[in-house]
Every structure is written in C-alpha cells, then in structure tokens.
Amino acid sequence: PIAMAKKMGVDVIVSDHHELPAVLPDAYAVIHPKHPAGSYPFPDLSGAGVALKIAAALLGEMPFESLDLAAIGTVADLVSLTGENRWIVKQGLQVMKQAHRLGLAALMEAAGIDTAVLDEESIGFIIGPRLNAVGRLEDAGPGAELMLSFDEEKIAELVAYIQEKNVERQSIVQSIHEEARIQLAKNENLPDVVVLGNKNWHQGVLGIVASKLVEEFGRPTVLFNIDEKTGIAKGSARSTEALDIYAALADAKDSLTKFGGHKMAAGMSLPAADLAAFSEKINNYAARYHDAIVLGESIYIDAILPLADVTLPFLKELELLKPYGTDNPKPIFGFQNVPLTDIRQIGADNKHLKFKLKDKELFLDVIGFNKGSISNHLNEADVVSLIGELSINVWRDSAKPQLQLRDIKNKHVQFFDKRSSVIQESVLAVEDALYLF
C-alpha cells in the first residue's frame, strides 16, 4: 500500500512502536522511538504515546487535554510503565477524573467506575476491554466516535452498543477458552510453546484467550483462526518472562507470511498447511529456554509484614508508587505463620476464595480470584504462610485493607471432617491425603 501511494504522489508517514523490521518502509517519514537514525531518550512508548508526541510536535506544545486517550492506549498496550509512559498515565488519569470528555465519562459511569478511585486498573480491566471489544469483534469506529462526540443522545447510543459488544466478547472468550483447555488437558506433557488452531475461533479475541492460557498453564501460547476459504491461519501469541516471543517468531520466519509484535505479545499469519511445521520450529527454538519455561514465573517478595503494619495510612503511602504495570509491578508482601478464619467461596460458580487472616484482635481480608477450589484444602484456624498484593478495598463508603492472594502454603498436618450422605468429587481430588471412612 505504501509503494502504491508513493507511486500516486501521496506522501505517507508511518508511526509505530513495534519491533522494527530489518528493512524500514519506503515512506516519506517513519516515526518510531527506536528508529536507528534517531536518539529519542525513551524507547518504550506505546502507539498512543507516539501519536501524542506527533501531536505535540505539530502543535508546538503538549496537548494535555489528550492525555486521557494516551493513558488508555499506554495501559491497554501493556508497555513498560516506567519513564515517560509512567508520566503519561499518571497525568492522563488526572485528566480522566476531570470528566471533560463526555463519551469517556458516560462509559465510565455505565461501567460503574467511581472517578474518586479511578486508577490504572480501571483502564486495564474495565475501560480498555470495552473499547477493544468493538474493534475485536467488528469495527473500532464506534469507540473513536464515542471519544469525540458531544451529542448526549449519540453518546448514550454508543455506550449501550459498546457495553453490548463487551458482553458478547466475554461470551466468545469463555467459549474459546473452554475449548482450548479441553485440548490442553489431553496432553500429559505440554510443549514449551502451545500452538492451537480452529476454524471457528474468532481472530479478534485470540490474544485475550492466549493470555488466560499462559496464566493457567504457564506456557507461551499461540492461537490461530484458520480460514478454510483462503487457507490462511492468523494468530496471536502471548508469552512468559522466559521466552522472547518476537525473537522466537523471527527464528521461524521462513514459515510465516508476516509477523510483528513485542517480547511478550505478537501477531502473525501463515498458510494453514504449515501450522505443524511452524509449531515444530518455534518449539525447537524454545527448547533452549526449556528449564526457565517449565520453572514458571518467579515472584519477588518485597517484604514480610506483621498484620499490625497493614494500616490505611501505610497503604495510602504505598499508592505513591502507582501507576503499576509492566516493569513497575505491584509490591508483593508476605505473611508468615498466621491463623486464618471465615473461609468461603464467593462469586459465580464459587470461582473465588475469601478468608481472613487473624492475629489476636487484628484481621486482614484476603481475596483469591479464580482460586475458589483452594477452600477444599483449608481449615478454620489453619496456620498458613502466604504472599499477595495489598490494596484499599472501598465498599459502601467503607475503606479497609485487603490482600489479593498470589500463593499460599500450609506446612502443618490438616484434618478435614467431610462427613455427608454424599461424597463430593472434590474431596477425593486432594493430593497427599489419607482418607478414613
């Protein structure tokens, strides 16, 4: 397309932030923070960050009113939240709290976001997915139109449409995720890189599903939609710290029609007939990192705390480290040999776990998302050690410290009384257990 435009006398300017190819496009200008001929001091801008800097250059000043859009793009793109990106997000959140962009304000209200506690997680888990949903499933135009509109009636219509598409996106993601999990459950020994494809999988959500599978199975994952008419497979990849997925794709480029992305995420296309060969090549490359991949995620514990130190003033001071994200993760805190109480499962299908840590008269709420099954391994008054992320949980105008559980350990012998007229299957699934009938 660039060559054709140039032939027709059109000057083309290319802006990007993905890894640069060996040969740059023959365009009028290529604007990239890592351009080999440049010396820009911060190489990790998102695509939205590059657009912000172009706007600033054209205007001769920083367009502060556009920092909300740049912040959303920066968080949603999962780039490094250090340096200039950190400034963009921190300032952008302040602009978002002012609610001057009517469409964004309406979307936040519909999604139940309280601007008083708006933060980077509000973007990453609520705003970003909604704006992404329309583009993933159909056309991204309505999201852009919402950000630009001043017509309240049109805004209400667009917000309703985006909310609807987000629900649809969630349903599609859940369906593909379940299908992929079933396929992986059949493999006793997972490969270093999981490669799966299906003609019925919606291409627009494959990256989301791949991320879920990486979190669940601990393997870099590449998922493909196979178009039977064209014979082309288009895919999305998500990785772990152990494997640079862009480098892995570059090593297998002979099998690919095109590819692009970053160390942790990428997209690609290739003839569907070459999927098996591609899987073999990328796994051959990943074999040199096998030990690191199998070992899994390493978690750095920032500090071991007594419950007495977990106070609202401490947590408010901790929030000065925000915004959290890639390369600026939330601090991880550990608690050792603490009794627990009030164990229960919560949420749809009892997917989540909730309990309290207790130290004399002190209590700390603990929430474990997607960890509901762990309740089968816990007893009231068990003494445990655990790690997680601390935050302030605001509910009905009440603020309390809360720990989001990452991992838990119980060294002691446990006794479970599961007497019932029916034996639950989950009871028999407990490892290293002795059963008395």
Residue ranges and their predicted role:
Residues 1, 47-48, 203-208:
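Short glycine/serine/threonine-rich phosphate/pyrophosphate-binding segments
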Residues 9, 59-277, 304, 346-347:
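Hydrophobic helix-and-loop "lid/oligomerization" segment in the mid-to-C-terminal part
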Residues 15-18, 33-35, 54, 72, ...:
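Fold-independent oxyanion-binding glycine-rich loops
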Residues 154-158, 164-196, 229, 250-437:
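Mid-to-C-terminal polyanion-binding domains and interfaces
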